[in-house]
Amino acid sequence: MRKSPRELWEDIREFDACMLVTRSQDRLRSRPMRPFFEGRKETILFLTSIETDKIAEIKSCSQANVVFSSMREGLWISLTGKVRLSNHAQAVDACWTEEFDAWIDDREQAIAIVFTPESAEYWDCSEKRAVASWDMLESIANCSKPDPGENQKLAL
């Protein structure tokens, strides 16, 4: 099953959580984030406080990775691209929900992280879920490797 970029975006929009990976001085840092989408734009927004380490990391290196994963759906998506910060009220408002009252004391302290993907890689095993357990048992019995499902790289 080959997916178009449009189909990939449809899949991504179904997720309510992901991992945002940025570069710290000497290592990669990952943290769970809630993705937000503005209309049909092919960017992902995240909301954070201006008082987090993510701000300095993004200012020093704009490269980032966003990873979506669903064992239940048999779908894994990795996006590589660039991040930038936006304190534009429209970007913050697009993300703000009541749940952020618990994380960010003052809405004025909120800033949006705008992620623009440049490439994507996904693994789709959704059509194999029913036979995945059998494939695993068979490969153990035969000392072989199971079929991991489909993998595709996309330039965005």
What are the language-model segments listed below?
Residues 1-19, 25, 140, 149-153:
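Extreme N-terminal tail/first-helix region
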Residues 12-16, 61-62, 116-117, 147-148:
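A short, compositionally biased
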